[in-house]
Amino acid sequence: MADVLRRAINQKKQFLKTKLLLSEFYQGRGEQLADYTLSELEKEYKSLQKMKKEI
């Protein structure tokens, strides 16, 4: 069970990192994003989505 949860968390982290890196704002910050927790990545992604809506 722990393996399934760990795998799901890693997949979600990879998905969020990819989305953030594809945005113009986060280009070149891959090493920094690699150290982020899932919660931090989700927060950054939500901030990015909010910024996109404001533009």
UniProtKB/Swiss-Prot annotation:
The protein's superkingdom reads Bacteria
Q: What is this protein called?
A: Uncharacterized protein YebD
Species annotation: Bacillus subtilis (strain 168)
Lineage of the organism: Bacteria, Bacillati, Bacillota, Bacilli, Bacillales
Give the gene symbol.
Answer: yebD
